[in-house]
């Protein structure tokens, strides 16, 4: 009997002890879980969401824009517009400094009007030096002395009431290659802005080479190669001084004048051009485009 009671006491003691340990562990574990849960909540609360960050950045930018004065906004947009203009204009200028222009606005317009044009590109080495000197003497005697815009020629044109042009060969190249024909202040402004850029990138020899290949020298006749064969039946490297001077007289009015059938005025003008070509060769004003 005593043994049985002692056995029961032992079992009851073990049960109570186990229950006590279990309660103790539960009591210990509950605060730990609560602590961990609170820690996780605080961590989540301390970390702002990506969406929140983006919204705060956007709000900051909008506030910064709002703080900008109209003058600053205008400066910013003008700066961007200027940068865009420089990129758009410099790329073709750089490209055509090494690649020959495939066509021009005038050539394309005449091709559409006439159905065909006479034109073949030739390097300046295959063009008689007399033609280069004649064209410079006739169109822009100070070609080697200015940076694209000739102030003296502009003043002379204004004094003459606009009866004669003040455009340099460089300006004519810009107009022919990059712009369009016709008179407008907008085109003239673009031409004035782009000409110094061409002068800064191209050599004078390259400018003259392009001019001699794209200039209109007769109805549907463009460039030295086509003009030499059309009027005289010779190659551009075989032109005489007189033939070169006659071609130069055609340039101001290529649709009305013919180098093969010169008028009295054209013959007189050709003689003046021959003298001018000899002068710029002697005084060094042809040095920038001749070897």
Residue ranges and their predicted role:
Residues 1, 7-9, 24, 85, ...:
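Residue-level detector of alpha-helical transmembrane segments in integral membrane proteins
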Residues 31-291:
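Juxtamembrane regions of bacterial inner-membrane/periplasmic proteins
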Residues 3-8, 14-23, 27-30:
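Short, low-complexity intrinsically disordered segments enriched in A/P/G/S/L with frequent Arg
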């Amino acid at each position: 009997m005593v043994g049985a009671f002692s056995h029961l006491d032992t079992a009851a003691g073990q049960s109570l002890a186990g229950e006590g340990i279990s309660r103790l562990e539960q009591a210990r574990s509950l605060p730990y879980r609560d602590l961990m849960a609170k820690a996780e909540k605080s961590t989540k609360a301390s970390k702002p969401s990506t969406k929140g960050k983006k919204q705060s950045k956007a709000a900051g930018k909008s506030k910064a824009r709002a703080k900008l004065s109209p003058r600053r906004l205008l400066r910013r947009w003008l700066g961007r517009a200027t940068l865009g203009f420089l990129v758009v204009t410099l790329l073709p200028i750089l490209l055509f400094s090494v690649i020959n222009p495939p066509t021009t606005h005038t050539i394309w317009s005449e091709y559409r009007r006439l159905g065909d044009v006479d034109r073949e590109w030739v390097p300046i080495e295959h063009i008689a030096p007399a033609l280069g000197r004649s064209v410079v003497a006739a169109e822009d005697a100070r070609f080697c002395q200015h940076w694209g815009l000739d102030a003296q020629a502009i003043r002379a044109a204004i004094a003459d009431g606009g009866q004669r042009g003040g455009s340099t060969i460089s300006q004519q190249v810009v107009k022919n290659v990059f712009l369009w024909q016709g008179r407008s202040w907008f085109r003239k402004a673009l031409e004035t802005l782009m000409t110094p850029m061409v002068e800064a990138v191209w050599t004078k020899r390259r400018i003259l080479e392009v001019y001699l290949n794209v200039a209109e020298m007769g109805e549907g006749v463009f460039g030295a190669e086509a003009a030499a064969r059309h009027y005289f039946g010779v190659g551009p490297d075989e032109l005489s001084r007189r033939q070169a001077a006659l071609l130069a007289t055609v340039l101001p009015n290529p649709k009305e004048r013919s180098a093969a059938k010169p008028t009295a005025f054209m013959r007189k003008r050709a003689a003046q051009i021959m003298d001018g070509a000899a002068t710029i060769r002697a005084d060094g004003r042809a040095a920038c485009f001749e070897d």
